[in-house]
Amino acid sequence: MNFQENYDVIVIGGGHAGVEASLAAARMGSKTLLMTINLNMVAFMPCNPSIGGSAKGIVVREIDALGGEMGRNIDKTYIQMKMLNTGKGPAVRALRAQADKDEYAASMKNTVSDQENLTLRQGMVEELILDDEKQKVIGVRTSTGTQYGAKAVIITTGTALRGEIIIGELKYSSGPNNSLSSIGLADNLHEIGFEIGRFKTGTPPRVLASSIDYDKTEIQPGDEAPNHFSFMSSDEDYLKDQIPCWLTYTTENSHTILRDNLHRAPLFSGIVKGVGPRYCPSIEDKITRFADKPRHQLFLEPEGRNTEEVYIGGLSTSMPEDVQFDLVKSIPGLENAKMMRPGYAIEYDVVMPHQLRPTLETKLISGLFTAGQTNGTSGYEEAAGQGLVAGINAALKIQGKPEFILKRSEAYIGVMIDDLVTKGTLEPYRLLTSRAEYRLILRHDNADRRLTEIGRQVGLVSDAQWEHYQAKMAQFDREMKRLNSEKLKPLPDTQEKLGKLGFGPIKDALTGAEFLKRPEVHYDEVIDFIGQAPEVIDRTVIELIETEITYEGYIKKAMDQVDKMHRLEAKRIPKNMDWDKLDSIATEARQKFKKINPETLGQASRISGVNPADISILMVYLEGK
């Protein structure tokens, strides 16, 4: 085969999955090519101008802990930072940043361009080149006929695969934001034999900032207290001059406009064929599914410091443009707003994810990986997490090293990938805290403690990041030791001080850690009694200490559950397993096992339609092998 150039890894698509995949592979020493349809759309945000949020924010922290880029990049380019769910327990707290979308993309493009071992090139890949047996990928062919050789290929094409934009009765071939649609590659994947699904997502109108009457909306400022996505970011760099978002609502008039035009809605007229996201429905879907609600929240989100475009979060729609004009003007604060871009729906092809291994390598073609919305997920963060895993595994495969699989107990990224490859998805998949059975372990504050050592082992965590992490953990250990040794004694002055703070008296001496276990007590109050540490304790260390001590009992119970699950995960299933030999299992279980081909007993136990009796039979069979 005649190749123009040869690479270790070729990544197709420069979105959020593609940049993480290519950076990971290159940083691990693989000669990498990132091919993208448009160099001006690297890490572009075609929908909401934000990073993080519930569950998603924890994923960004996990990406950072493993040595990925998304957290570092948003810390350089945000216009607002906010910790969500602060009134709830630590398991559901998550960080969200409003991004300067142009700065975010430009900064990430610079990072990619400057990365050693990584070549960024504009071009459209139309075909995968396979070996003579049609079992292994060996390169790609572009629309210009140029052929590039590769030992591994990662497809991260987002919503571009046979993408079609829909606005009212208008439907035309396009990727996101009127970029080119990738039709040749979509056809090629179908020809190779992949099962292809058709999904849909959408985006709301954008309006001119200067045409908004903010007096009719509620200001939503960022946090004054510093927070960051990257564990390497400094509190000294926390942005003081933040830009607020604004809250408004739909009205009864908004709903009337929508109801009167539902017959023109592509979602209901049959124009939209793809399956849409359950957890991010269009406004026309909302007023139909939740007809009893008098109004729906809308967030006016600035798209950056140097643009007048404002994103109307919560108003995703593919209604005809004339309906969108009327709809926007029915919203308080937007009566005189000038619409800059209409909302639209986009349909696209997906590789149904049950065809993937937990490494995100396809079962059908060796060396071929897929990640991001190509796999049926929604969201920049979910895409980036998958891209990182695919990039790591592509590099490891080439190096002949053990594969990288995150467990459900180790990361939300692990939960997501296990859900995708074990259960599959029939709609755009979104990460939720409720999907994680070990969410008290998978917290925002301990992502580095969970994953930095793993990232170091695979060769992605830099020396600087590793030293920073080790210093933090050493301080954590020293302060935990001090809190478990220094005591509050039931002396008169201690009792008086406790009373002034609103705490009851103590009968026996308590260690600082025992006092901190009380739900109403915080670290600063413990220090009032046992004194300051001989060093300045980092804010993030204090946060970790408070959670680990306060919830120690619950965390221990969760870890006991993890140990039980790990025993199931340790039982491997042979790759060439003959499922027909299991005579006693239910027919549905046999069919599911054949389709998913689980790799461990633990994975088999999580397949929908498989009951405990089937797992017991499988366990007995494996133990007899």
Curated annotation (Swiss-Prot):
SUPFAM superfamilies: FAD/NAD(P)-binding domain. GO terms for molecular function: flavin adenine dinucleotide binding. GO terms for biological process: tRNA methylation; tRNA wobble uridine modification. FAD binds at G13, G14, G15, H16, A17, G18, V125, S182, Q373. Keywords: Cytoplasm, FAD, Flavoprotein, NAD, tRNA processing. NAD(+) binds at residues 276-290. Its cofactor is FAD. It is found in: Cytoplasm. It holds the Pfam family GIDA_C_1st. It comes from the Bacteria. GO terms for cellular component: cytosol. InterPro entries: FAD/NAD-bd_sf, GIDA_C_N, MnmG, MnmG-rel, MnmG-rel_CS, MnmG_C, MnmG_C_subdom, MnmG_C_subdom_sf. Homodimer. Heterotetramer of two MnmE and two MnmG subunits. NAD-binding protein involved in the addition of a carboxymethylaminomethyl (cmnm) group at the wobble position (U34) of certain tRNAs, forming tRNA-cmnm(5)s(2)U34. Belongs to the MnmG family. This is tRNA uridine 5-carboxymethylaminomethyl modification enzyme MnmG. The gene is mnmG.
